[in-house]
Amino acid sequence: MSNANNSAMNHITLPPISSFDNLIKAAERQYNGEASSASTHPTLPNMNISNGSGSAGASSSMLSYQLLPHSNDVSRSNSSSSFLPSVQQPTEGSASASETSSSASPSRSISPILKVAGPSSVGGAGVSTPHSTKINKPRKKKQCPICRNFYANLTTHKATHLTPEDRPHKCPICHRGFARNNDLLRHKKRHWKDEILSQSGVLSNHNDGKGGSVSPNDDDTHEKMTPMNSVTDYAQLKSLHQIKGTFKCPFNSTLIQLDMDMYPYKLKPLNFETSNCHQTGVFSRCDTFKNHLKALHFEYPPGTKKKDRNVVPGRCKHCGLKFENVDVWLNEHVGKQCGYKYH
């Protein structure tokens, strides 16, 4: 019995160490995905054992066969998790590997397709985002049925197509109609322009008379031109001062005098100097009113350019107080500490 065992042990031979090295290297290549043809061949390459014994070759082939399923599972899992770009551009080796993996596990082959198809359907060309819709949204303008032009305020524009008698804003003096309130204000200022200038001329002649004497003719003329003389003049004066949305210059001598004539209780000495800065002293726009004050009623240093007016110091022309800049003077001084307050 012992002789039989000894003879069996004499017939069993192990493969050389170099063959195990080749086996380990082949398994590493299979695990790293470097051997693309490993899934198509049942045995690993270069596994011939050079000792000439059949048992050693059989044992080495069995070892390689035992390692192959594990390496195939690893490569299959790697391909399903990290080879998503290969779905768009497959190679020959990857195509064969994907076919084998799809036949082995259908769920693994479907899940990468679903992952790729999801983002493409969301970010497709047919889907529009709210941001792009907001950018491409046109401005809301309505077309005029008469002139076929587009306007933001179509109701106001339609009034321009009406006759002057049918327009909504009418002048109380000549009964002419206007489409906008600002147009009516400018029209009223034209009615007052000649009358105010004539009043100023008569008053200046009255004050500058030679020898301090006034002729009866001049006195009669002055009485005729007094704003409070007739009901018509008073109505015109009242309509000019009571127009809503207007801006009145607090330093205009003509406008201040007209306001005092309308409201006698306000007749008192002023603590500032007035000036004949404007024909009427009434403005329909706030920006025009502020530009008028900055240009004519604030004194800048000599040689100051127009672009530097907001940053240089100066003083009020009517009371002499100094300020850091014209904006501080306009916001804190005009109409509060200096200037006439209208009714």
UniProtKB/Swiss-Prot annotation:
Residues 46-56, 71-86, 94-120 have a biased composition (Low complexity). SUPFAM superfamilies: beta-beta-alpha zinc fingers. Residues 31-56, 71-140, 198-222 are annotated as: Disordered. It is found in: Nucleus. Pfam families: zf-C2H2_4 (PF13894). GO terms for cellular component: nucleus. One of its GO terms (molecular function) is sequence-specific DNA binding. InterPro entries: Transcr_Reg_ZincFinger, Znf_C2H2_sf, Znf_C2H2_type. The modification Phosphoserine is found at S71, S111. It comes from the Eukaryota. PROSITE patterns: ZINC_FINGER_C2H2_1, ZINC_FINGER_C2H2_2. A zinc finger (C2H2-type) spans 169-191. Residues 33-45 have a biased composition (Polar residues). Its main location: nucleus. Keywords: Metal-binding, Nucleus, Phosphoprotein, Zinc, Zinc-finger. SMART domains: ZnF_C2H2 (SM00355). Present with 1240 molecules/cell in log phase SD medium. This is Zinc finger protein STP3. The gene is STP3.
